């Protein structure tokens, strides 16, 4: 058999899941064998992913590759349909890297190690399935499977308020999943044919009411996971109580699932409805940035400050997706990858700091940079990446989003100025709360409660390896963005072009100011959009 025809994606998804099922029969008394087993499986799966994409993925194609489709449960229309394209491929690699490093970061877990590593592998498999599923029911199945391990990881291995945080997480995400199911079934059963194939759903014609309601339903569902204000309140609690490996995956992968689904379903599948909601996304993105930055500055808990920082950074994804430009959409994808790496590194280093100080309250810290200089240096590097220092990946992503929205020809100049200026306020606040974090934790007067006169070990080789594995790609992408953008540029060009195809056209020309001038023209092809926008004026 030709290796290119090998079911690579099925193997990549199945390996962690099958390996997790074998954990109960592995002979191990102290948990040492299980942790090596979990790390080996995660690394092997990540290596298999890299090998498959390196040898057989065509970076110049925007079409789906590694396509597999099997009838799984034909009675309910469920097919095992998986494929990868430029949008999902970089997020798959991010998922593989973050999960592998998170398992390595959990090296000291001694409480129920079999259950812990089993849940980590099941979650890993489900996350991969979300990014490659091409059947709506399969996507929903993977989306739901992923929730259970996250809930258990927080509720069993979390902090003092872990059960409250885990319950809040599952209530938010489970309730949001109902919107996926309802919106998906509305689209699947619309028209003469019933299908759950995502590509086929994107080609169907829908009544305007159904399309708008489905878009709103998907936006709510994926907005919880992204998260979008005001659906974000589960995130600070979850981060505040989750262990360091759990927070790495929460920030590094889970939030990206929401951004990915927003592109795949709302923009690619429902471009006509996106015309109505694009300005809303831009406004919500600005709110995320400003609100997240202001709330981050007010936090005294280290992990909660980073959680609100994540909310702010994901606001740039929304603005990029609303821009209708190639560079804006490309910047949104880059921002997702960049934030995954940066947030994972900061949450891991926060866990390293917590192991030494046994507190997350910044007002009880101070002066630990003197006894932990390596940790201080690594944390500073992560903070610089988070505040989008030039030469770091975050700078490139945010700059592309700013250029995308500023050069967009579908918004009025006044709207673009307001979006850019308010977003810039959030950018200015970011170094304030991050530098304040560094000052409170690593500088200042030494806290007597921490007993810093006693020996506190600095970062260890394992911890240094994990941090370096995250910081090196951050710097590499910052210095040479094409390292990652070449994997999805062709796809983002297609996404932006596909979204723009449904924009009203006057005399064969692309609109110069869609939401201010073009809808007032008498020759519009879309009179209903004209009416809506005029009413909003």
UniProtKB/Swiss-Prot annotation:
Catalytic activity: a plastoquinone + NADH + (n+1) H(+)(in) = a plastoquinol + NAD(+) + n H(+)(out); a plastoquinone + NADPH + (n+1) H(+)(in) = a plastoquinol + NADP(+) + n H(+)(out)
GO biological process assignments: ATP synthesis coupled electron transport; electron transport coupled proton transport
Gene Ontology terms, MF aspect: NADH dehydrogenase (ubiquinone) activity; ubiquinone binding
Keywords assigned by UniProt, alphabetized: Membrane, NAD, NADP, Plastoquinone, Quinone, Thylakoid, Translocase, Transmembrane, Transmembrane helix
Subcellular location, record wording: Cellular thylakoid membrane
TM ranges: 6-26, 36-56, 87-107, 115-135, 136-156, 169-189, 209-229, 243-263, 277-297, 314-334, 335-355, 387-407, 417-437
Coiled coil: none
EC number annotated for this UniProt entry: 7.1.1.-
GO CC terms of this entry: plasma membrane-derived thylakoid membrane
A Pfam family the protein falls into: Proton_antipo_M
Membrane topology (UniProt): Multi-pass membrane protein
Family that this chain belongs to: Belongs to the complex I subunit 4 family.
Function text: NDH-1 shuttles electrons from NAD(P)H, via FMN and iron-sulfur (Fe-S) centers, to quinones in the respiratory chain. The immediate electron acceptor for the enzyme in this species is believed to be plastoquinone. Couples the redox reaction to proton translocation (for every two electrons transferred, four hydrogen ions are translocated across the cytoplasmic membrane), and thus conserves the redox energy in a proton gradient.
Protein name as catalogued: NAD(P)H-quinone oxidoreductase chain 4 3
Chain's gene name: ndhD3
